[in-house]
C-alpha cells in the first residue's frame, strides 16, 4: 500500500528536530510495510531529498529568500509578526496543488493523508478527485483556531471535511471542535512519544523513591475515551509484556518541578511562577526549560518574586499587593526558587528529566482561544517516569485521568498547582500509584504499535471501498 503524507513541515536534514512525531509516525508506517512519500513546502530553496529513506517532495512557492512561511515557527505566528507573508499563501496552495497532481499521476498512492487541513486539504483535493484516491484529513487543533480570527475559514473547512473519506483528530477535544463545524465521524488518532523504547533506556537505580517497585501489574478492561474496546484490545504494550513502571527518579535534596516547552501564553507558565509563592524554598525548586516570546517577561516575574524572597517582609508585600488576600493565605515567607535553563541539548534535557521529581503543564485557554490540543510532552514525561500535574483544559484529559495517571487542576490556579506538588512530595505511595496508572494509560492508548495499527485499518478500509 502507498500513502502520500502532506504537511507544512518535515525535517529538512537528518539532525533537524522539526515535527519529530510525524517523522516517527512515517518510520512506523514504513516498518508496517506501507510505502510512504512526503509532500512538504521548500524552505529557502530546499530541493527534494530523502530523510530516513523516505522521499520528501519539496514544492517551491517563492524566491528562495522568501520561502520562510513554514519551519522553525508556526505559519500563523510568522504571518502575525510579518503580515507580508500572507501574500505567499496563494502561490503556496497553487504550487502545492500542482506538485500533488504530479506525484499522484506518476506514483498513484492508495491514500492521501493531509495534516493541517487548512490549507493542505485544498492542495490534496484536486489529485484526490481526479485520480479517485481516498483522502484522510488530520487535525491537530491549530487550524481550528483560525476560525476565531478569520470567519471565512469556517465554510472552507466545512467543505473540505465533507470531501474527505476519513477525518483524524489528535484528541477528543479537537474531535469535538471538528464536529461543531460539520457533523462527521472523527477517528481519535493521537501521536505517541518520540523517545526511545522503554527497554532501551530502562536501568536499575538504588536512589529511587521509596516504595516504587518495577514490574507492578495493572488491571485490564477499563473503558477508554480514545479508542473502542476492540481498538484497546489491539493496542499492544510497547515492550511486548506486562506493563512496567517507567524509569524511577531519585529523591533530590529539593523536590524538583520540571516544565519543558515554548514560553507562550497558552502554556500558563506565569501561573507556575505564581505557585512558587506557596512552596517553601527549602523543599521545592521549579525548573523552566525552553524559550519563546514571553521568556524575558517571565524572568522579570520570577525576579520580582526572588526579591521578595530575599527581603524580611516579603509576605506583607505580597499580601498588600493582591486584591483578594484570602486566596493568598498560604503564601510562604521564603518562596521556592525558580531556574530558567534556556534551550538545552538532548543530553542536558535528558538529565533534567532524570533528576526531576514531577512534570507540570499549567496550560490555559489563552486570549486567542488557543490551548493544548493533546499535550504529547505529557506522554513523554510519563514514559520517563515522572508523575504529572497538568491543567484540565483542551486535550490534556485524554492523557491525564485525574487521580489515575496524574493530577488535574483548574487552569490559572497557582494555589491548586502548589497543593498538588505538596501532595506528591509528601506521599511516595501516591507517586507509585500514578506512575502505574500512567504506564497503563500509555500502553492502552499511546503506543506507536496501537496508533499505527488503527491508522492502517482506516487506510485499508478506504482503499477497499
Locate the predicted segments by residue.
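Conserved acidic donor-binding segment of nucleotide-sugar-dependent glycosyltransferases
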Residues: 402-403, 407-414, 423-429
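A conserved mid-protein helix/loop that constitutes part of the nucleotide-sugar donor-binding site
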Residues: 20, 255, 259-278, 293-296, ...
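Acidic donor-binding loop of glycosyltransferase active sites
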Residues: 354-369, 386
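N-terminal subdomain of nucleotide-sugar transferases
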Residues: 1-60
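Short hydrophobic beta-strand element within catalytic cores of glycosyltransferases
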Residues: 378, 383, 387-390, 400
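Donor nucleotide-sugar binding/catalytic pocket of nucleotide-sugar-dependent glycosyltransferases
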Residues: 37-40, 57-58, 137-140, 154-198, ...
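Nucleotide-activated donor-binding/catalytic signature segment of Leloir-type glycosyltransferases, i.e.
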Residues: 299-309, 313-348
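A short, well-ordered alpha-helix in the C-terminal region of glycosyltransferases
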Residues: 416, 423, 430-445, 454-457, ...
Amino acid at each position: 500500500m502507498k500513502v502520500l503524507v502532506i504537511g507544512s513541515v518535515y525535517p529538512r536534514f537528518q539532525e533537524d528536530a522539526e515535527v519529530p512525531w510525524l517523522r516517527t509516525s512515517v518510520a512506523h508506517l514504513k516498518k508496517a510495510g506501507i510505502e510512504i512519500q512526503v509532500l512538504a513546502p521548500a524552505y529557502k530553496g530546499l530541493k527534494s531529498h530523502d530523510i530516513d529513506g523516505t522521499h520528501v517532495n519539496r514544492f517551491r512557492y517563492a524566491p528562495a529568500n522568501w520561502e520562510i512561511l513554514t519551519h522553525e515557527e508556526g505559519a500563523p505566528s510568522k504571518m502575525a509578526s510579518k503580515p507580508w507573508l500572507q501574500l505567499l499563501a496563494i502561490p503556496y496552495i497553487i504550487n502545492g496543488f500542482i506538485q500533488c497532481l504530479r506525484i499522484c499521476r506518476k506514483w498513484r498512492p492508495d491514500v492521501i493523508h493531509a495534516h493541517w487541513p487548512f490549507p493542505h486539504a485544498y492542495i490534496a483535493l484536486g489529485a484526490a478527485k481526479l485520480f479517485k484516491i481516498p483522502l484522510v484529513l488530520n487535525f491537530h487543533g491549530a487550524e481550528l483556531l483560525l476560525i476565531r480570527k478569520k470567519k471565512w475559514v469556517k465554510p472552507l473547512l466545512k467543505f473540505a471535511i465533507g470531501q474527505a473519506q476519513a477525518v483524524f483528530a489528535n484528541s477528543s477535544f479537537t474531535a469535538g471542535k471538528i464536529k461543531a463545524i460539520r457533523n462527521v465521524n472523527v477517528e481519535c488518532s493521537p501521536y505517541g512519544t518520540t523517545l526511545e523504547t522503554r527497554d532501551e533506556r530502562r536501568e536499575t537505580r538504588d536512589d529511587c523513591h521509596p516504595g516504587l517497585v518495577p514490574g507492578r501489574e495493572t488491571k485490564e478492561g477499563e473503558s477508554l475515551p480514545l479508542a473502542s474496546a476492540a481498538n484497546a484490545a489491539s493496542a499492544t504494550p510497547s515492550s511486548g509484556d506486562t506493563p512496567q513502571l517507567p524509569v524511577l527518579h531519585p529523591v533530590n535534596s529539593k523536590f524538583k518541578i520540571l516544565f519543558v516547552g515554548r514560553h507562550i501564553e497558552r502554556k500558563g507558565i506565569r501561573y507556575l511562577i505564581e505557585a512558587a509563592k506557596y512552596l517553601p524554598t527549602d523543599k521545592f525548586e521549579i525548573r523552566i526549560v525552553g524559550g519563546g516570546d514571553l521568556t524575558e517577561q517571565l524572568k522579570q516575574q520570577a525576579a520580582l518574586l526572588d526579591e521578595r524572597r530575599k527581603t524580611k517582609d516579603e509576605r506583607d508585600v505580597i499580601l498588600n499587593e493582591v486584591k483578594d488576600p484570602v486566596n493568598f493565605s498560604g503564601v510562604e515567607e521564603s518562596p521556592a526558587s525558580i531556574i530558567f535553563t534556556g534551550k538545552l541539548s538532548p543530553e542536558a534535557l535528558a538529565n533534567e528529566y532524570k533528576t526531576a521529581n514531577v512534570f507540570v503543564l499549567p496550560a490555559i485557554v489563552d486570549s486567542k482561544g488557543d490551548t493544548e490540543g493533546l499535550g504529547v510532552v505529557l506522554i513523554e514525561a510519563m514514559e520517563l517516569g515522572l508523575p504529572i500535574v497538568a491543567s484540565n483544559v483542551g486535550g490534556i484529559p485524554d492523557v491525564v485521568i485525574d487521580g489515575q495517571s496524574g493530577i488535574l487542576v483548574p487552569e490559572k490556579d497557582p494555589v491548586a498547582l502548589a497543593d498538588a506538588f505538596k501532595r506528591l512530595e509528601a506521599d511516595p505511595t501516591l507517586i507509585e500509584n500514578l506512575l502505574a496508572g500512567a504506564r497503563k494509560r500509555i500502553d492502552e492508548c499511546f503506543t506507536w504499535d496501537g496508533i499505527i495499527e488503527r491508522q492502517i485499518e482506516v487506510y485499508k478500509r478506504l482503499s477497499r471501498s
